[in-house]
């Protein structure tokens, strides 16, 4: 009798696990750049910010920075900030390439925090890393501009997180630890 109860319990757990896996498989993937519900855009003007990342171009003429999840540039001499890359995705940590022609940044546009690269003027943004679970951030260029080193974030129940340094070619790929 106890053996029958054990078999019924095991079969029940298997069925529940299978149904749960099917529900997760059929769940619609959320796209940060295509919100499903209604939303309203709000315009505002700021003259200061906090928790910003700032980088100066190698030629010393331009500053790139993030503010509220968008990336801007401004001349070092002052003037109006220009939006380089913005939208629904949260984009931060811009860094000029050694030759000043490209800017890398962290974006959640692909569903998780990954490293992206765009031209200095904000055009032709391209996702470099394709991480779907571990978050990538704090990207920096190699001196020759061919590689990017970024921190891959790991979390556990015992800590707030730890990181590993990963090397990626600017053409993409899996990267090396």
Regions found by a protein language model. Give the residues of each.
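Residue-level signal for pocket-adjacent positions within structured domains
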Residues: 37-39, 79, 123, 173
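Short, conserved catalytic or interaction motifs in soluble domains
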Residues: 76
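Blade/loop signatures of beta-propeller domains
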Residues: 22-43, 61
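Beta-strand-rich domains and repeat architectures in extracellular enzymes and scaffolds
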Residues: 39-72
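Bacterial Sec-dependent N-terminal signal peptides
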Residues: 1-24
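Post-signal-peptide, soluble extracytosolic/periplasmic N-terminal scaffold domains
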Residues: 61-63, 81, 91
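Blade-terminus and WD-like Trp-Asp/Gly-His loop motifs, strongest in beta-propeller folds
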Residues: 55-61, 94-102, 139-147
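A flexible loop/linker signature enriched in serine peptidases of the S9 family
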Residues: 22-26, 47-48, 66-72, 85-92, ...
């Amino acid at each position: 009798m106890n053996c029958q109860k054990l078999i019924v319990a095991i079969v029940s757990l298997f069925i529940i696990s299978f149904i749960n896996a099917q529900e997760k498989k059929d769940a619609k993937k959320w796209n940060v750049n295509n919100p499903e519900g209604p939303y309203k855009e709000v315009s505002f003007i700021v003259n200061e910010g906090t928790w910003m990342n700032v980088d100066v171009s190698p030629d010393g003429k331009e500053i790139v920075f993030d503010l509220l999840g968008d990336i801007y540039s401004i001349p070092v001499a002052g003037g109006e900030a220009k939006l380089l890359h913005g939208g629904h995705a949260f984009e931060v940590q811009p860094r000029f390439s050694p030759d000043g022609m490209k800017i890398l940044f962290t974006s959640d546009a692909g569903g998780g925090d990954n490293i992206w690269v765009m031209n200095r003027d904000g055009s032709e943004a391209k996702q470099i890393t394709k991480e779907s679970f571990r978050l990538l951030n704090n990207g920096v260029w190699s001196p020759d501009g061919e590689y990017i080193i970024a921190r891959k974030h790991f979390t556990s129940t015992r800590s707030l997180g730890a990181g590993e340094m990963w090397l990626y070619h600017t053409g993409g790929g899996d990267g090396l630890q």
